[in-house]
Amino acid sequence: MTKEIILGIDLGTTNSCVAVIENKKPIVLENPEGKRTVPSVVSFNGDEVLVGDAAKRKQITNPNTVSSIKRLMGTKEKVTILNKEYTPEEISAKILSYIKDYAEKKLGTKINKAVITVPAYFDDAQRQATKNAGIIAGLTVERIINEPTAAALAYGIDKLDKEQKILVFDLGGGTFDVSVLDMADGTFEVLSTSGDNHLGGDDWDQVIINWLLKSIADEFNIDLSKNKMAMQRLKDAAEKAKIELSGVNTTTISLPFIAMDSSGQPINFEKELNRATFDNLTKNLIERLKKPVLDAMKESKLSLADIDQVLMVGGSTRMPAVQNLVKELTGKEPNHSLNPDEVVAIGAAIQGGVLAGEIDDILLLDVTPLTLSIETMGGVATPLIPRNTKIPVSKSQVFSTAADNQPSVDIRIVQGERSLAADNKLLGNFELSGIEPAPRGVPQIEIKFNIDANGIMSVNAKDLKTQKETSITIKDSQGLSQEEIDKMIKEAEENKEKDAKVKHERELVNRADSLINQLEQVVKTENVPQEQKDAFNKQIEELTNARDAQDYTKLEAEVKKVEDLLANAAKFAQQTQQQDPNNQKDDVTEATVTDDSTKK
């Protein structure tokens, strides 16, 4: 009998990752480009849909590119692309579908189950929206678990015999989460959670981008903030510089031909950025990391001295200033035994392994991220399930009527920490009718909350005298109907082959256009021999003809030929550079369209 495979997916704001259990050990699956993470970016170009690195390269230059869609999960907001509206679930489903497809190819089998992680602060609607995205992508979501909990699960897999208190410091590309967990005898219990949903590595990138824009404006008296091509290069260069400064004290950002000045001359910009300057520019971001840590510790009712391990999660935790802050706050050396980009997906895969019976002796106890209450007389939010209650859980309480002979009660369920219901988020409401006439306070109405292992809630109301009852499942109150989900699943399946063909052809044309541009630049260079210029002009003509004729077989052959030609040109340029003693330094250069540089 073939063993069941359940994918562990970290569906991140900036990057996503997938892992599975093989021989009782988690392994991270590489994507088709050989990378272990996938940018959570989707780009539309006519019939073509790009996901991941290919989409990220068009993030600024193509206005029909969507990133950080996770921020909209569980809301009614939609994105309009090429005159068509897409829900956040639909965009997320394209990322999940891409991950599912390459996982199936890697493992050589069909896969239809997954465990997906979400931030600890995701509410019920956001969790249900994540499940819906999985369904649209053709996945049964077996479990939704919190990202910090997944990270702790990954960390604890080899240390089940040690009782420990763990602080999980999770700084990703777009969100920041802190959790305090108790781990003992194979059981993980979340004691507290805190965080900032709008703080992540992207903010550090933006600081460098702003610094570069000002530096270029000061030196060349030009504003590049509206120049899409230039901004894409600045974004790529900023991310590279940030990553580089995690390992060296100084890096050089080189941006040749970044724009044209007022006289039509090309602008070549180069500037050093050292770690001290970078840390000074971003000190306000570092400061914002403190409060969530202190809040989580306060709520856990533990002191920092009680913490045994600080687990770093998310690529942004590689920054030395972040690590120094953690040491300063906790007095502990941060634990780097796990890859921060992959640890959440690994934890999700382990949970999948538990559900599939591949791994034993682990019990995952998750918690409710916010207090769940009902609205009572005077608009008060009366809590039934406090924040950080372990789930699954079921709790009930008896209420009564607010007026004499009241025939029905309206049950309004809210989520949040405020005392008044109006100040919290309304999750849903329903009515229990048919209450027998009686003075106020006499009827007994039992309200029962039930939350399953995915954090999805149902509420039941019963008249204890008549035994009449009614209930509601809080099911994506801000999102999609089942009909919409079914329609999207059908559309995704019907267009799968067509999408793949169109994607290949469009990528080929994009490569050809990029090569034509590169060849044209080389032809304009003075020190290139005329013979080589003639060869390049010939290739420009061949590429252009094949592209315009939509002869994709010929175009593919010509693209390969030109890439070989450019490789030889690169060798020539390298020899020229080696002859110049003034050009012997390590630079960080922006990515070109064809550059697949390492992403966080």
From Swiss-Prot:
- This protein's UniProt keywords: ATP-binding, Chaperone, Nucleotide-binding, Phosphoprotein, Stress response
Question: Known InterPro entries for this protein?
Answer: ATPase_NBD, Chaperone_DnaK, Heat_shock_70_CS, HSP70_peptide-bd_sf, Hsp_70_fam
Cite the source lineage. Answer: Bacteria, Bacillati, Mycoplasmatota, Mycoplasmoidales, Mycoplasmoidaceae
What Pfam families does UniProt report for this protein, alphabetically? HSP70
PROSITE patterns in the record: HSP70_1, HSP70_2
Q: Which residues carry this modification: Phosphothreonine?
A: T175
What family does the Swiss-Prot or TrEMBL record give for this protein? Belongs to the heat shock protein 70 family.
Q: Which NCBIfam families match?
A: PRK00290.1, prok_dnaK
Underlying gene? dnaK
What does the record note about the induction of this protein? By stress conditions e.g. heat shock.
**UniProt-annotated stretches for the region Disordered:** 572-600
Instruction: Provide the function of this protein.
Output: Acts as a chaperone.
| GO MF terms, alphabetically ordered | ATP binding; ATP-dependent protein folding chaperone; unfolded protein binding
Q: What is this protein called?
A: Chaperone protein DnaK
Instruction: Name the species this protein comes from.
Output: Ureaplasma urealyticum serovar 10 (strain ATCC 33699 / Western)
- Extract the PANTHER family matched here: HEAT SHOCK PROTEIN 70KDA
Q: Polar residues compositional bias: what residue ranges?
A: 591-600
